């Protein structure tokens, strides 16, 4: 038997959080469900054998126990209940009754015996920072995480914790994104690991845009991100991550300042003629205080002039329009510095104040002679 009562809003929020880690399809039916454990409170878990999310909510438990419910149907039932106190009852045969106001649902559940335990994360190292900071860092780097399984290590983001703070790096072979923030709470000294990109997308969602803290724990094989009453556990990615420090060129004699919004608008205009079927690089001619942009495909030709500050020394270089726009869009600044060398050298985007809290690198695309 399981019996508890809880506010609908709390259950709905918890179900939404853990459902993101539930397997869509599995040979183990329990993995398509949410594990509910009743003891001193109510704990809900979702696990797809790669990533697990569990959270605890306040509930009045009259009979302790555990049961598994299909995540999709349970979520739909809870969502449709009126905003009131929900009463949950399950008998010895795992038949479930949900009551809330005048509404009720009945549904068979599953035994929790077949539900695999989430991995235990042995605390080797940990670091604590504000949730809004980690949320922003993931958002501003995860777009550059590789989706190419040929290099599994690059399907995640590198976390480096040192006296410089927390550095996050993502790379996909065409671009690199780096964010750095100072830290106050480090337990265990310097350490580093690679977290899967898919798991980080979920970490971004469980982190609130507040100064509440999140703790990141590195274990031998797994990682845990703990924000309030919610924990996300995932595997560490193993392998040799790119030596990003040596991959970033340091000789960049051309340096111009760019207003992000203005350049994104110019790129967006010339990108109108570019499509998935008709791809073409954006041709950029960096001149004195302006960049001449153009693109030509079977859809037509587009041109624009973007004002900048600095001498581009008549450098002509091509870029993938989306990669350059992403770097400008996710850079946490209104104005950035673009550093260039030759038409076949990467473009480096950094803060105008020479701080090291972000860096984006975009590789060029070879241009055909016109």
Mark where each language-model region is.
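Structural preference for solvent-exposed beta-strand-turn elements
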Residues: 1-370
């Amino acid at each position: 038997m399981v019996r508890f009562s809880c506010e609908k809003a709390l259950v709905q929020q918890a179900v939404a959080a853990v459902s993101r880690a539930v397997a869509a399809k599995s040979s183990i039916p329990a993995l398509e469900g949410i594990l509910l454990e009743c003891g001193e409170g109510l704990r809900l878990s979702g696990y797809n054998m790669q990533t697990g999310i569990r959270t605890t909510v306040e509930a009045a438990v009259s009979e302790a126990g555990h049961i598994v419910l299909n995540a999709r149907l349970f979520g739909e039932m809870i969502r449709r209940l009126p905003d009131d106190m929900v009463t949950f009852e399950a008998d010895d045969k795992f038949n479930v009754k949900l009551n809330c106001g005048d509404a009720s649902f009945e549904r068979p559940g599953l035994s929790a015996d077949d539900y695999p335990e989430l991995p235990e994360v042995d605390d080797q190292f940990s670091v604590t920072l504000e949730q809004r900071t980690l949320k922003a860092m993931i958002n501003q780097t995860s777009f550059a995480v590789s989706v190419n399984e040929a290099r599994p290590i690059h399907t995640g983001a590198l976390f480096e914790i040192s006296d410089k703070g927390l550095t996050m790096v993502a790379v996909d072979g065409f671009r690199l994104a780096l964010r750095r923030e100072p830290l106050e709470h480090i337990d265990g000294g310097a350490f580093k690991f690679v977290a899967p990109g898919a798991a980080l997308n979920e970490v971004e969602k469980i982190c609130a845009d507040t100064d509440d803290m999140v703790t990141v724990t590195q274990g031998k094989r797994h990682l845990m991100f703990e924000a309030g009453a919610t924990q996300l556990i995932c595997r560490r990615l193993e392998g040799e991550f790119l030596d990003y420090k040596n991959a970033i060129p340091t000789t960049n004699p051309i340096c111009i300042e760019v207003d992000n919004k203005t350049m994104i608008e110019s790129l967006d205009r010339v990108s109108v003629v570019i499509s998935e079927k008709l791809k073409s690089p954006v041709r950029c001619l960096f001149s004195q205080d302006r960049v001449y942009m153009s693109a030509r495909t079977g859809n037509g030709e587009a041109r624009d002039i973007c004002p900048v500050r600095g001498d581009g020394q008549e450098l002509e270089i091509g870029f993938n329009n989306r990669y350059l726009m992403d770097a400008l869009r996710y850079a946490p600044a209104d104005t950035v510095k673009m550093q260039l060398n030759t038409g076949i050298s990467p473009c480096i985007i950094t803060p105008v104040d020479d701080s090291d809290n972000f860096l984006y690198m975009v590789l060029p695309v070879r241009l055909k002679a016109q």
